Design a protein with these regions (language model features):
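Terminal transmembrane helical anchor/hairpin motif
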Residues: 39-61, 192-281, 294-316, 329, ...
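Secretory targeting signals
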Residues: 60, 67, 114-175, 179, ...
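Internal/C-terminal transmembrane anchor helices
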Residues: 290-291, 333-369
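Membrane-interface segments at or immediately adjacent to transmembrane helices
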Residues: 362-453
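Conserved small/polar residues in nucleotide/adenosyl-binding loops
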Residues: 719-726
Length: 726
């Protein structure tokens, strides 16, 4: 009997009337492989890529585009074959007929799996072989390409079984198509939806939650908790040649789906056909899995809508409403009777208790999320958003063994390889200031108009802890100017904070593209464009000054900013290939603050003849701007006397940027006009405003606490408050 089930004659017998399935799949794989390959290769030839580039692109084709096109048809095949093989379980007549045959259910199960596999595998292999032959005819053939084709077959076969058995499992535990469709949608979407809901709730109740950089369970649920998202993540890794770990996860998950669906099939009661759910205990579990998040989500929506202190009351109302509605709708579906909406009140009460517990975990922070900081000995390194902390927008540049460079922009700070660390983890003083920042978060709950009790300017700093165990923890802290300075000081003193800039400047000056600097007056100058020896001299001077600078030197007020760009050789990447370009290159960009202690740099820059600092700029007139409580310009005054202008220049900060470790006056600024008629905007340093300005304004500290967002609210969030003076 076993041999008969696997014989070609038996397959032809059971496939009568079903030939449209392999025919349809043959058409799909014809489009996914030969047609897609011909279209893409034709476009490459028209773009005039070099032969080496064409071979690189062709290898990438088998690791990227054909993975997607073939994968899409593979998923369609899994859906069609699973429906063809197991949808009969929803029909009482078909169940009675098939289960009356003298064939064991286990044999029947594997027969349907085997038949579906043939429907999928035969057209797949034919069309993939056809695509390989087309590539060989166009000059693309090697053992490596054959290996890529074989690996692609195995990858798609794994994806086929994953989706096939996940759908079969749904057929085996549900009794009608409506519930089957709902359960299948839930299987594919539940994990990501739950992850998003948990992230929203964490953002709403945990002030240190970093919503832009999910990690841990939040990232796991969003990216890996459903067959669809897990497959998408695997495709990305596979393209980069890093998919082995996720392939193992997919394989294990496929085995689980196979075993559970097999168990559910052979134990499925025949009389379950037509019923919404086959197994009562599973139905109860699914109900709780749906009702609890619905209650939480509805409560959170009602928590966000009001702006008054009654938001907690509305949150409770929303939780009750969401729990009752979700429970009632699911129960009505289970019993196929709307009168069952309020049935099973004990389960409704249990769900309400679970919703309450979850709400308390968030609202009361029972897990101490905001107060948590890893132990010092557990921390291996720190990831810091340096653009917020120090205004550093220098790219991450690292030279590879083959002489090429890897280049990532400053927004890549959260990657593990871009972390800062000392000789052995982080230093004691760095950890102490981090503890201080964490302890102060309780008084800085600014997201939902919490009570602000501190004065000063605040920024939101994104930070990541890399632990020795391999885990990572992401946080978003609100820090003031003093804490910015202390943290930077200790990072310079105990960690390798200088390394990023030093690695950037270590690039050979032969790759140098441009050097410019922005003076303290806000004007930019391209320098030494025709003197490469002076450019090299300047870079060496900056490198020397950075190495010799003490931490306190790097926390002074910068007098200018140096901009440097390199054009560096990089590894060939199919996504950035330029037709005909044999040696790919990429621009690396850096902005480096220049401090008064940089004597060597200053000496070289003086050769340009340009004014370096604000003090060296000839000022003709100054217009002082005063702002009201809303931050709108209220009054203005002009000054032209030399003594007054000198005093204003001494009190003004450079106009090329603001610095997190420097405190500024919140309600007054200036527009300076040079002798040449050029204007530059400047802020005033805290406590440095001349007396005649104070007399003119009456008070420079007249604005209430206000939240000001700059760019991304999660990366640079400013808050100016004078609460302590009240």
């Amino acid at each position: 009997m076993k041999s008969k089930i696997c014989s070609s004659e038996y397959v032809r017998t059971v496939s009568r009337g079903k030939s449209w399935i392999p025919a349809f799949l043959s058409l799909g794989f014809f489009l996914a492989f030969p047609v897609a390959l011909l279209l893409v290769v034709g476009n490459w030839k028209a773009a005039r890529y070099t032969p080496d580039q064409l071979h690189l692109l062709y290898e990438g084709l088998w690791k990227e585009k054909l993975v997607f096109t073939g994968g899409a048809i593979t998923i369609v095949a899994a859906i069609m074959n699973s429906i063809n093989g197991f949808s009969y379980v929803y029909s009482r007549k078909k169940v009675d007929f098939y289960h009356s045959l003298p064939v064991k259910r286990s044999r029947m199960f594997w027969n349907r799996v085997y038949t579906g596999l043939l429907y999928y595998l035969v057209p797949y292999m034919i069309m993939e072989f056809f695509a390989v032959c087309i590539g060989a005819a166009k000059g693309f053939f090697s053992l490596k390409l054959m290996e890529l084709a074989a690996r692609l077959l195995l990858v798609h076969l794994l994806l086929y079984f994953l989706f096939y058995f996940s759908i079969v499992l749904v057929f085996c535990v549900t009794g009608n198509f409506l519930m089957g469709v709902l359960c299948l949608a839930g299987m594919q979407l539940y994990g990501p939806a739950l992850g998003i809901l948990m992230s929203f709730c964490a953002y709403g109740f945990f002030d240190t939650f970093s919503s832009n950089y999910p990690y841990g369970i939040f990232k796991a649920l969003e990216d890996y908790a459903s067959p669809i998202t897990l497959t998408a993540a695997f495709w990305q890794k596979y393209e980069a040649g890093q998919g082995a770990a996720l392939a193992a996860v997919l394989f294990v998950l496929t085995l689980i789906f196979t075993a559970v669906s097999y168990f559910a099939y052979i134990h499925r009661p025949s009389e379950a056909a037509g019923k919404p759910m086959v197994y009562g205990k599973l139905a109860a579990v699914i109900k709780f899995m749906v009702v609890v998040p619905c209650g939480m989500g509805t409560g959170f929506v009602f928590y966000l809508i009001p702006t008054s202190h009654a938001r907690n009351i509305w949150c409770v109302f929303g939780m009750i409403l969401g729990t009752v509605l979700a429970h009632g709708m699911i129960e009505a579906l289970y019993q196929m009777d709307f009168h069952a909406f309020f049935s099973k009140k004990v389960q409704l009460l249990a769900a309400a208790v679970l919703v309450t517990v979850c709400a308390l975990i968030y609202q009361k922070d029972l897990l101490n999320f905001d107060a948590y900081i890893p132990r010092q000995e557990d921390i291996k390194a720190l990831n810091l958003d340096m653009m917020t902390l120090s205004g550093d927008m220098t790219d991450y540049v690292k030279e590879q063994e083959d002489g090429t460079f890897s280049i990532e922009d400053s927004t890549s700070w959260e990657k593990r390889e871009n972390a800062f660390s000392g000789k052995d983890g982080i230093g004691e003083e760095t950890y102490e200031i981090l503890q201080k920042i964490v302890e102060n978060q309780e008084n800085r709950k600014f997201r939902y108009e919490g009570e602000q009790t501190e004065e000063g300017t605040f920024r939101r700093l994104q930070l990541g802890y890399q632990l020795r165990s391999g885990r990572e923890v992401k946080r978003s802290y609100v820090i003031n100017t003093e804490e910015c300075g202390e943290l930077l000081y200790n990072l310079y003193k105990e960690e390798n904070l200088k390394n990023k800039t030093e690695q950037f400047l270590a690039s050979d000056t032969a790759y140098l593209d441009n050097i410019s600097f922005i003076s303290g007056n806000g004007r930019g100058y391209d320098i030494f464009q025709d003197h490469p020896e002076k450019q090299k001299k300047l870079i060496e001077a900056v490198k020397t000054d950075i190495q010799e600078a003490a931490p306190e030197d790097l926390l002074a007020l910068p007098f200018a900013e140096l901009h440097i760009s390199y054009i560096l050789p990089v590894t060939e990447d199919i996504h950035s290939l330029v037709p005909g370009e044999e040696k790919p290159e990429k621009r690396a960009y850096g902005e480096i603050n220049l401090f008064p202690s940089y004597k060597n740099t200053i000496a070289v820059l003086k050769e340009t003849g340009y004014p370096l600092s604000f003090e060296e700029t000839e000022i003709k007139k100054a217009k002082i701007l005063y702002y009201n409580e809303s931050g709108e310009e209220e009054t203005a005054a002009e000054y032209t006397e030399k003594e007054q202008l000198e005093a204003l220049v001494q009190a003004a900060a450079p106009s090329f940027g603001t610095f997190a470790w420097i405190e500024y006056e919140p309600d007054v600024a200036a527009i300076f006009q040079t002798e040449q008629g050029e204007e530059c905007y400047a802020e005033f340093l805290k406590g440095r405003i001349p007396e005649f300005i104070r007399q003119e304004s009456g008070s420079t500290d007249n604005r209430e606490g206000e939240l000001t967002e700059t760019g991304n609210p999660e990366s640079c969030l400013l808050y100016t408050s004078d609460a302590a003076d009240d």
